[in-house]
Amino acid sequence: MAKPSAVDQPDGAGLRERKTKTVEEPVKPSATSGDGGAAQTKKKTIGRTPDGTAFTVPHTRDMVSQLLSPSEPKNLSDILVLSIIGLHIVLLYLLPSYFRIPIFAVLFLSWRAAYNIGIGWLLHMQSNHSTMVLWARQTKIFVNPATGKNPHPKLYSFIKRELETKIPEDYSFEDAPIEYNTWLVFRRVVDLILMCDFTSYCLFAIACGSRPAEENFLVLILRWIVGMGLVLFNLWVKLDAHRVVKDFAWYWGDFFYLVDQELTFDGVFEMAPHPMYSVGYAGYYGISLMAASYKVLFISILAHAAQFAFLVLVENPHIEKTYNAPPPRKRVLESHAAAVTANGEEKFSRRSSDSSDMAPPPSPVALPSSTHNLVGVKNLDLHRITDSSVILIQLLFFALTMLTPATPIYQFFFVLNAAVWRLWYSVGIGYILNCQSHRREWTRHFVKFGETKEEAWNQWKGTYHLSMTLCYASFIAAAWKMYTLPENWGYGLAILKHVLGAGLIALQIWTSVSIYESLGEFGWFFGDFFFDEAPKLTYSGIYRFLNNPERVLGLAGVWGAALITSSRAMIFLALLSHTLGIAFIQLVERPHMQKLYGRGLRQDAGLVRSIKRSLPPSFKQLHGSVDRILDESIEFIEEVLDTARPKLAAGVTTFVKDTSELFHKYPARITITRIEPDVAGYDMNDYSLSVDTADCITIKDGAEDKSEVPVFEYGSPIKISWTAPLNHSKKDWVGLYMIGQNPSREVTKVSSWGRWVATNEGSFDSVLSEKGLLTSDTVVSKPDSANASANNSKKSGKSRKKSSAHEVASGQMVFSGDKLWWTQGVFEFRYHHNGKHNVMATSRPFEIRIPKFDDEHIPSHLPPNGGGFMTTAVEQALLPIVQNCFDRDPEISPQTAEEPFGCETESDLKYAKRVVYAVHQMFGIEFATEVVRADGNVQNLAWRHAQVKRREHTYSRSRAMK
């Protein structure tokens, strides 16, 4: 069934599915947007560059049409692409048969690497640093040579002719934004790589193609029919996807600019997540089937896996950053006003683990805290009895499986054990949930003994998690016992069975991960059976396409194991698992969802809607009749079970102890040293670095600090000034390092890990290098010194005229945010020459310190409800530090103790980690990052600190009285 959540957030599940980005900045129209009048402009697609420049996006043709259609104008780049494709085809016929397979395997893998690694790197750099646009600006290839600023006039004319030939309407090379022209050039590179990638793959399949000797004619026909069907389906997916997303998303246009239009996603984007990368590769397996070659199959799987890696590492991060940005933070008054709806109902998440919607710790909570999750390796906590029990049980199953022989009697008991645990996991757990749904039996049991419903919820999570582990551990153990290695891998379908089985197992793992990502911890453990506050449905993630993904895809792995083992016993277990899984959905989950959400339930998911639209009316009527018969049968079974259900008493009592161990990891010292061989032409005395000490703090923790090292507050921006000779390199840069990292004062041998700023704009291929740059190359006067003149005369052989001062270049920059070391210590700045690691100047050392909180001014004996003294004091001390942890950004940094943190706390753990470290150093209390995210503001953190201190004080008094 569809799963409920607090917010119906769009998923961005389809490949290159782009939502419209609203831009509120003033529009700076370019020359291309004014042609044709306002009426005509409305009919055209309007693009918008990152700086707000609007322009008309010309109509472009798809890759295949512009290359192969005779009606499309051709240019030199088209001829180049077609020539390279032709060379591939000629090479196939010229090579000897024994060379064809390895040569074309290498060719295809090379083009695939150019696609996934080459294009992936370019897009990653463009997304994060605008690298390709910076290259275009630095080389000035799009600047009109008539201005005298373009050093490559012939290249300019060539690119202009190439692009204007392909886009005859609504396009002017001189007037188009640099982002759009850069994208057009990038498109031509993509055309070459993609066409050669596909061509080399097809030629590799032809080289490997053969007919098995034992294959009969019927199997041959069936193999080609299925293979052609997959290829045609692949072709339809590509064409339909291009119809929806057009060239803009097909060629990753939003890495360069955005379009102002409503984007609709239907057709193939309703059928599967990331259709271009998932079902869009079905043709690979169709070609493998027609070629009847395992070589083609394995290279297809490798290419498909590389494409998914491209999606995860390149596409998804950009989509999240561009289209799924956190909503604007609500201020205190807005949050209070929106906390209650018009009907007086509080708005809480239903089946979502989003902790930002939780009530603060001091006030009553409607939903359980998600600060200590249970599912996943990253949440493993061996101090928790559930986790330690799960690990011990899995070790026990492993030992029993490995140490016992695979005799029929042991195989029988392993299969029986797996069947019993599957029955418990479906029938037993289903019975508990059904009782909880109708009579709240599980919760009432704990309330009867004075526990809260949160304790009942925690105990239920442990029970369900342990049951699920036992179910699948026993199934895996049974599969291992029933499995035997094939005697001859080349005989029959042994390899194919293992490949398909592994694919089905991977499909179940992916489905489970997708379900957990959509539902969160709350939905994974059926939280709406235990909490009733303001349910709201969500159809994000995998639920956008399927109502019950666990019904089929969620059990694909058990059939994969049955296929690999080829055992009747495993087929029985797979059939039992699937039958019980469907029964659990129909008899337990579906009735509860209907009772809770009623008509709010969606009838058909995206995939079902797409299939129904393609069915004739007669099939639709038959489908409705079958649904009615199934519903009546299920109602009858429910009535029988209700009358015959025995009373089941279930209770589990455990003591939960929450601790965490955090290890502060310092970056590894990687020596990547680049040295400029000749720096003799520069006056070393003209280089200097000075730290602005206006923001230094006075430590009030009682420690004597007799050193003259300036001290800065943790996370506060640090402003520095530099000077250099007028002829200094434009690629100079300043890095921030911890004292002791670099033993040499002449050369830096440790990476700065991104903590550096360029002295001049446009010198490096990254916009991040200029972040923090305030001024550069301001000419100032610097006093001469006798020593400096003497040293300079010895080095350069020249003498400077005697004067009281001479001119040098100067600049200012500020280090803040990710360019700071988020730890305590003593640091220094280093000025480096010409993009290398030669040190030209070093700043005065300075210290980053977090002042210790002084508990002496807090009353030692606080009444039970009198923690306000400590809470207020902690709030005042903590607020400035927390503001620094959030980079003093008004969008996410709290201005008061009551104001909530920005939504970036949820998506980026770095802010929470900074706060955790600061609290630990300031108060001696170590919280988990989940606690910071759940508390949501300084007031709640201060309240939590007061509670911990009160417990410590109570514990100390009880120890003293003994």
Swiss-Prot record:
Subcellular location: Endoplasmic reticulum membrane
Catalytic activity: a 1,2-diacyl-sn-glycero-3-phosphoethanolamine + S-adenosyl-L-methionine = a 1,2-diacyl-sn-glycero-3-phospho-N-methylethanolamine + S-adenosyl-L-homocysteine + H(+)
Cited InterPro entries: Phopholipid_MeTrfase (IPR007318), Phosphatid-EA_MeTrfase_fun (IPR016219)
Membrane-spanning residues: 79-99, 103-123, 189-209, 217-237, 271-291, 294-314, 390-410, 412-432, 466-486, 489-509, 569-589
Keyword hit for Zinc-finger: no
EC class: transferase
Catalytic activity, EC: 2.1.1.17
GO biological-process terms attached to the record: methylation; phosphatidylcholine biosynthetic process
Residue ranges annotated as Cytoplasmic topological domain: 100-102, 210-216, 292-293, 411, 487-488, 590-962
Spans annotated as Disordered: 1-55, 341-370, 780-808
Pathway(s) this gene product operates in, as recorded in its UniProt entry: Phospholipid metabolism; phosphatidylcholine biosynthesis
Coiled-coil ranges (or none): none
UniProt keyword annotations, A-Z: Endoplasmic reticulum, Lipid biosynthesis, Lipid metabolism, Membrane, Methyltransferase, Phospholipid biosynthesis, Phospholipid metabolism, S-adenosyl-L-methionine, Transferase, Transmembrane, Transmembrane helix
Chief location bin: endoplasmic reticulum
GO MF, any single term: phosphatidylethanolamine N-methyltransferase activity
GO CC annotation terms, alphabetical: cortical endoplasmic reticulum; endoplasmic reticulum membrane; perinuclear endoplasmic reticulum
Biased composition (Low complexity): 781-794
Membrane topology: Multi-pass membrane protein
Biased amino acid composition, Basic and acidic residues: 14-27, 344-354
Stretches of the chain found on the membrane's Lumenal side: 1-78, 124-188, 238-270, 315-389, 433-465, 510-568
Pfam families per record: PEMT (PF04191)
Described function: Catalyzes the first step of the methylation pathway of phosphatidylcholine biosynthesis, the SAM-dependent methylation of phosphatidylethanolamine (PE) to phosphatidylmonomethylethanolamine (PMME).
Family (UniProt): Belongs to the class VI-like SAM-binding methyltransferase superfamily. CHO2 family.
Protein name, as recorded: Phosphatidylethanolamine N-methyltransferase
Taxonomic source organism: Arthroderma otae (strain ATCC MYA-4605 / CBS 113480) (Microsporum canis)
